[in-house]
Amino acid sequence: MSGAGSKRKNVFIEKATKLFTTYDKMIVAEADFVGSSQLQKIRKSIRGIGAVLMGKKTMIRKVIRDLADSKPELDALNTYLKQNTCIIFCKDNIAEVKRVINTQRVGAPAKAGVFAPNDVIIPAGPTGMEPTQTSFLQDLKIATKINRGQIDIVNEVHIIKTGQKVGASEATLLQKLNIKPFTYGLEPKIIYDAGACYSPSISEEDLINKFKQGIFNIAAISLEIGYPTVASIPHSVMNAFKNLLAISFETSYTFDAAEKFKSAAAAAPVAAAPSAAAPAAAAKKVVVEEKKEESDDDMGMGLFD
């Protein structure tokens, strides 16, 4: 290795070591067909909230091995280091970095021999191609017609499917039509967070909900088996307080917090008494009136006996 090459290697190792020891959150992404200018734009976009490391996987793995004693959790990354791997280091804003990455995508022509990342459909309508090129389209089994001195495609054409290898004829046609069917950018494959790896499709909200559910499950199990944990202690304290309060109501034993509840309970019947008196008086009046009517009927019947 030349002196210049050795120097570049040492600079890369020093930079990578600093990044791996500074950050605990990372996005591991594939960088196929991502150019240097595009990568530079991504670096500029995330400046202040993250950093980008692009290099050979053998070099990155060497740095991870060298840090095995101080940061053994980094070994989880080795599984995801591929040929064209880019690592984006983040602070506490993975969602923002992912958003920036998604906006930094550029259109690209279809090149022969490339596997299509998405379907390619040519719409029906004018092509701008001269009638002399009709045979070229016919070889691709595309129905055409001549309209106003140019070739029109009769029906929509599904020319390339996802995962299909792009042929030379398809690539030439798309170039003639000035269609750039593919977009390329960094493709996040895994999120690394302090030794844990998960899919980039999982949002921070999903993680928070899972965390809450885990705490709930731990608390439930702890309460069931009577084994105190940080998650169950608040519930245990509340249950103990309720039991103590119940004992205070049934016995002469009391304490400051119980007195507040006792005072509230004692005031409740007093407040309800005036409202309860009115229905009782009304009911009494109805009973008296009914008895009075019965007495009148008896008196009337006696006059005609």
Curated annotation (Swiss-Prot):
Keyword Lipid biosynthesis: no
Listed Gene3D superfamilies: 3.30.70.1730, 3.90.105.20
GO molecular function, one term: large ribosomal subunit rRNA binding
Database matches in InterPro entries: Ribosomal_protein_uL10 (IPR050323), Ribosomal_uL10 (IPR001790), Ribosomal_uL10-like_insert (IPR040637), Ribosomal_uL10-like_insert_sf (IPR043164), Ribosomal_uL10-like_sf (IPR043141), uL10_eukaryotes (IPR030670)
PTM comment, free text: Phosphorylated.
Cellular compartments per GO CC: cytosolic large ribosomal subunit; extracellular matrix; lipid droplet; phagocytic vesicle
Pfam annotation, one family: RL10P_insert
Top-level taxon of origin: Eukaryota
Any one biological process term the GO annotation gives: cytoplasmic translation
Keywords, comma-separated and alphabetical: Phosphoprotein, Ribonucleoprotein, Ribosomal protein
Subunit structure: P0 forms a pentameric complex by interaction with dimers of P1 and P2.
Family per similarity comment: Belongs to the universal ribosomal protein uL10 family.
Function: Ribosomal protein P0 is the functional equivalent of E.coli protein L10.
Protein name: Large ribosomal subunit protein uL10
